[in-house]
Amino acid sequence: MEAKVPRPRGRPRKRQRLEDDNRKLNNRGKKQVLEVEPAVPISLLGCYMLKDFDDNEVFLGKIVSYDTGLYRVIYEDGDCEELESGDLRRLIISDSYLDDELRVRRKKLDKLILKKEEKKKRNSPENKAVELPNQVNGVQARAVTNSEDGDSYSDSESSESGDKRGSDLEIEAPLVPPVDLPPSSGTIGIPEEAVAHLLSVYGFLRSFSFQLYICPFELNDFVGALYFSGPNSLLDAVHVALLRALKGHLERLSSSKSVLASKCLRCIDWSLLDVLTWPVYLVQYFTAMGHASGPQWNIFNKFVVEIEYYSLPIGMKLKILQILCDDIFDVADLRDEIDAREESEIGFDPDRVATGLLENVPRRVHPRFAKTSAYKEKEVTDSSTNESKDLDSRCTNGGSNEVSSDLDGNSDECRICGMDGTLLCCDGCPLAYHSRCIGVVKMYIPDGPWFCPECTINKKGPKIAHGTSLRGAVQFGMDPHGRLFLGTCNHLLVLNISVNGDAVVKYYNVNDISKVVLVLISASSHTLEYVEICKAITQYWDLPEGISLREGEIGLTQAKDREDGKVSEITKSDSANISNRSHTQTVFDLPTSTLGNTNSAVTGGSCGIQGKKLAARVTYLGLSFKPNTYNNHYTNGELAVSAAASLAVLSSEETHEPDLRKYNSAKKAASSNILEQMKAFSLVAPRFFWPSPDKKEITRERCGWCHSCRLTSASRRGCMLNAAVAGATKGAMKIFSGLFPLKNGEGVLSSIAAYILYLEESLRGLIAGPFLSESPRKQWRKQVEEASTCKALKAPLLELEENICSIALSCDWFKQMDDWLIEHSIFQSAPVTLGVPQRRGPGRTKQNTQAEVTAEGSDADSFTWWRGGKLSKVILLKAVLSQPATKKAAWQGGSKKIPGLNYGDASYIPRRSRRSFWKAAVESSKNISQLALQVRYLDMSLRWRELVRPDQNLQNVKGPETDVAIFRNARICDKKLSDNKVSYGVFFGNQKHLPSRVMKNIMEVEKTQDRNEKYWLQEAHVPLYLIKEFEESLHRVQMPSSTKKPSKKLSKLQRKQLKASLMDIFSYIASRRDKMEKCSCASCDHDVLLRDTTTCSSCHGFCHKDCTSMSQHTNGNVEVLVTCKRCYLSKTRVPTNINHRQSTAPQFTINVRHQNAVIPVIKVKPPSQQLSSQKPRENTSGVKQVTPDSSVSKSKQKTLSCGVIWRKKNVEDTGVDFRNQNILLAGRSDKPSLEPVCGICLLPYNPGLTYIHCTKCEKWFHTEAVKLKDSQIPEVVGFKCCKCRRIRSPDCPYMDPKLKEQKQIKRIVFTNQKQRQGNSGLDSDSERMSEQKDSKPSTPLPATPLYPPDDVFIPEDDPLLVSVSKVKQITPSSFDLEWSTTAFAPGPQKLPVRRQVKREDSDAAYPELHPIVKPEAEEQALPVLTEWDLSGELLFDYEDMEFEPQTYFSLTELLTADDSGGGQYQENGDMVVSGNPQFEPTEKEECEDDMGPCQRCLQMDPAPDLLCTVCGLLIHSHCSPWSALPGSSWSCGQCRIRALGSITLGSFGAITQFKSILPDRSTKVDISLAGPFAGAALSVSMFAVGLFLSTEPDAANDLVQVPSMLFQGSLLLGLISRATLGYAALHAATVSIHPLVIAGWCGLTTTAFNMLPVGCLDGGRAVQGAFGKNALVTFGLSTYVMLGLRVLGGPLALPWGLYVLICRNT
């Protein structure tokens, strides 16, 4: 870039147009503070600058005013000049660069400017009353004076006029102190000094959200993102959007031969900018542009070396965002948008001169331009301006649904991508969108009005646009003390912009604005200025008309008296307008006590102020912010824009081809259009993405404008754009699905670790070294998975790159590249880095202000500019080597050359390769963003396009035969290494003629034994995918599988597949010749090459790799399970039979009349059709058997059995409300507070999975657990889980493998027990009871069906609805209770269970069911009879059961008579007895008269009054031999004995019951022996210590006397005691021992009894675990005999008592 020639001093002001002057004169008497030019910068006012003139003199100047794009500068010699902002930006200096000399010169300059101001006041005193402070954001509205001639201006005239305009800025603070304003409202949770930057940046991002592709967000979330000290998606998306816009701007500048922009782009690859690497680009951009200069940016430089960007102070973050937003104002797209808005609202300016991009510089604006929702193109004329404003106001308010003169009032193109197609029209603004561009799921679109994201945020957040889309804030005026009053984002902002004042910022919400107005109007000085400010504030916020400015009028009168009545006409007219609006009672007339509460003082206002007050109650503290909930859906629109642009380029290339006859038919034209779209979409489809646990990269919606999306709704073709994106990421998605969750958390570090694992998995076959063996590979993967810091990931990444074969990397990875890096020394050049003159020392007179780096400078000269330092090393990694190379060179003392460096012959500067540079960059990475960038560099250097077989459908088939076609049947059959060069032997199959370009690369042709030719080629000339397949087959790592099978033995299914391939013998022989053996895939039944197959872990069949899913578990070891789709969808349920305790109570047969209801799942034929198809003799029950209709698909029946209710045809309810409330999609961020837990697998919430909610039990489940696919979600209208439906719950695929294995073991044990004890007639899987053909109906059923045939459905696997042909009919004769004669007989007893089944309607509502049995047929109501065996209850608790505990009714409830004749049901399913609605059956009710006779005397009168709560025995109190306590539960004598036996067991097994299923018998042995061994060790210790203390003389007083026979019962204890106490002591009558001896003896005795191999003692359990149950019986009998004999021959009767006590109930 050439140095700019400085402008001559004394440049005249721009000439004003006459119509502009007339417009300002006409508007002068009106609301002047609002009629100003668009917002312009304020940051340059009051700044100091140094400028070098042609006479080699450097003058210090000060910017004093601004007018019509020009800044007035006064120099220290008294001269002045008007410059543009582009010239000033490079000349401004900050306070940190002022030395003592410059400070003295600055003070003299300030005095000179002050003298000019005083002289101007004396010469023109009338201007003080006429000119009011009218600056907006530091912009002074042009005051029209009568002295202007309009033709030419001298230097002195321009200086004086400029001084008049800037007089209000440089006046020193008057003697009267400024008015003390109330404190800020405190509703924004950031420091006050940063509020201005916050509102400015937020308004800018909201105003240009479409141009920047930033999905709108609330101010509260923005504050939370700034405060969050870790990575968050909102802050990442904002920075990425801003930097991408700047990237395009730099590219345009580079194309215009801008040296600075070119070097900024060449220093770092901007194509790698993403949500993880953007901090590196931010540092590089700020350093290149000189933004991070000055001591206040030291913490920013520290971030580059040490800390993360997110930990910066919130003020620093906002300053960085402010600078980025300022620089984006020069982006071409943004300037076009601003011009279009200005043209549509203000009108086209024919005299406007377009400023070149090179001369545009960032403008800092306070506040920003605001956005308009209805974007108008440049063709909009002045006549349609009013209509556009009406549409704007309708969008902003979002209230009315009026439409314009168009048909629907909405645009015909998507607002984001600009394409037509299927659009979603907003009801709040005239915009339309593709659902994919804004990330809206169609199933969640309500039936009523729908509002776009912009309108939704406008309703929630503060208002950005105010009357015009070119102004984001309204300026109310500036007081004499330099405080500017602004209205923005529904807040009053007060900025101190005076040169000598402090940067004080205060803000007030709507509730506090009245306080500010009261304080200003009560000021004793400068009343005139404050009245104008208060008037503008009152008008802007629509304060109630009852609030007048009466006190302001009094202040005006006093001001007039002080100024001798010299008031301008404008002031008089304004005060007259104010007085006309006043009323008798105002807010200022209220007492002082009411001023403290402005909400109660300001009443009776308009609706506008009330609405704003409601909005003002919202605080923006960011307390509820969650870091990963925001999802920038507008990036989908950016992808669509790129796809449309690529398609346009391809279409233009096709139209320029001369052969136009190829489109002679519409079919060929459509085919060509489809091919063009496929090519265009494939070019822009991103291959790379950072994996995340919440799967935000998943896009479900269609684009709306491709060829497939434009077809009719009946077409089942998928979206072509989605297909291209899915094809580009298909391999990565398959691997990523099994990686999460990793052990290093859910942050960005886990994404980097997951991608490193993906690189290793994708390059299998092209990685050598330790990755070829399984054990080192496992250790490496474990190291990556457990890495918790950035430093921990460096070593695995470097190890991975070190072992990648060079053939898999591009050639640029090994090229020398330091030659162009040295050119980028601009970042270390002091003049260019700072962009302003450096600090000047004494005697230094000048320095060039615009130093440019010349491109023709030599490398040596460029290198001498480099200053070194940590900052430059981190940014550009100059002169940085990897640590191993540096240490080795240091040990050698510099005597040898460093390996990996190219020293060359002509240059003395060694050059590094890209690989060496990358290694040094990885080792010097200090934060996550730097490491992520290096991962992306490595990923970019891999030859991804050649790793997979290319798709020939998208290849350009024109011209000669492509390499893809040549190698389509080729395979590598051999490999050899000679002279460190690798060659491969390629077999081309049946291809006999090869092109010349292939033959010239052939090194040797070798004949094989089967007379085939093997062509030897170097590895560089062989396709990479062939090398990968060959190397992977040679060094295939056997992944551990759950099914261990001999490698040489084929399964039955594999043999069947291979046998089927032999049916066509000729094709098989040809395939064997070409090594192309095929077989049918076990999943999809299509052909698959045997070399490309993978084996399913379940069915052991050959399958496509795409037909399988891989799941990895890292519980200590890497465990990979490969499951084909067929096995995953058709997993057979393990039969589970619920065995319960065997009932010993008398059997009661209870005839219960109830309503039969069915669940609408499977259609039922009308009875008339079934009667004709069935024989009368087979249908003995008189009820039609239910058969599923064939029209219902099998897949749908399987899904229906899990409780999903589908949408029916011709039903108005679409289920939108149910899906909005009860289905939580993966990555959905509109419900951040909802984190459900799956009710089956009990795993914590995973944002990457979809959940569905049961409306009955309020539990959530994974959609995969209920067999619900994502494509079927739009058809769901309801859901009720399996437990609520009383069916067996399926297994969740995300269940912990250990928990899943335990459940399977329980089911197997459950099934085995049921089979041993005998089936009671009800199978829990088939859910059908044994047929009872002897039951005949007494009354036939009605001929007409009770339900319409289309509305009656019955699930196949509902256990509550058994086959009616197999239900025992209860006739009226057996209505009363009957006492079974086999009450205490062994075996399973029958007990009927009463259940009610609710009907599921399509609208997911449950109205009150009506009886389906007519009154005359009530007695034929069939109860459901089931049998319950309770013998296995000790092994299971209710949590292990397949049904809920409510299924097990108490005997009191079951014995309660039900004479209601069929109760009705509420909506929640609870039964209400029709006879007495207030009756609620409980377990504490007393027995009624009709419960049954006494089981002792068999008498019904009087009624039995005692009921055993355990066994259900019903007797009279006078017949009972057992006593009964009043008010307590009663149990019979046998149950009391059982309870007594279980209580007296004590520690013998009672407190060591197994609460869960043991995995194997060895575990049972270990557990059984652990307790006795521990007790024996403790007892022996106590016994030994006690014996030792017994011999001590000091412990004589603690000894006790015991009989000596105590030690004669055990040989071991007797010998130990004899050795310790002596022979004489043990032969005496009594022995003196310590009490610890007795305690140890008792413990050993107890342990010995506990080890007896009988019953449930630990010894019995150990024997059972070691030898089995039959061995325990043998050991038990032998123990009983031996104990009996021991009791007869010895004095101890304790063993026999223990035997009676323990073994009696086993």
From Swiss-Prot:
GO terms for biological process: chloroplast-nucleus signaling pathway; positive regulation of DNA-templated transcription; proteolysis. Residues 148-160 have a biased composition (Acidic residues). This is DDT domain-containing protein PTM. GO terms for cellular component: chloroplast envelope; chloroplast outer membrane; ISWI-type complex; nucleus. The chain crosses the membrane at residues 1539-1559, 1569-1589, 1596-1616, 1624-1644, 1682-1702. Disruption phenotype: No visible phenotype under normal growth conditions. Residues 1-16 have a biased composition (Basic residues). Residues 394-408, 1167-1194, 1311-1323 have a biased composition (Polar residues). A zinc finger (PHD-type) spans 411-458. The gene is PTM.
